[in-house]
């Protein structure tokens, strides 16, 4: 086991063709599966399907990030999650995603103008130190949206079907709560 290196050669055209077809098929299945999950997540956000929102994000968190990615001073811990979520949302070419946008009486974490001109989503994120604080943090996020009137950004754009979403993160886990803004 020294510095020796070996070359690998595909022995003939038939074997090369089998490798090519299998690799292409694997890529197609992988891409389709990921795209399907992503589309399910976007739809879950639009519909307020908490179970699918959490399932997708928890899968991404467990497979994609390290707890070291979130090591920051306390006030900045949610930034990693914020950036991850903005990246996921901007993958939907039909949506206009706004990050840290001035809205109402403050700055909303994320506002999504969906492809439906009557609909939109306001998302507020929270980071907590322990898993048993997650539900309370989700409620706090929804309360913040209401108290600071972040939904006004979408209402001023004549969007009336507005979904509010509070998401709490703790290490590699998340919890979500959603509600529909009552129409006045």
Language-model segments: residues:
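Extended alpha-helical interface modules used as scaffolds for assembling large macromolecular complexes
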Residues: 1-149, 174-184
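Domain-level recognition of nuclease-like catalytic cores that cleave nucleotide substrates
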Residues: 153, 157-184
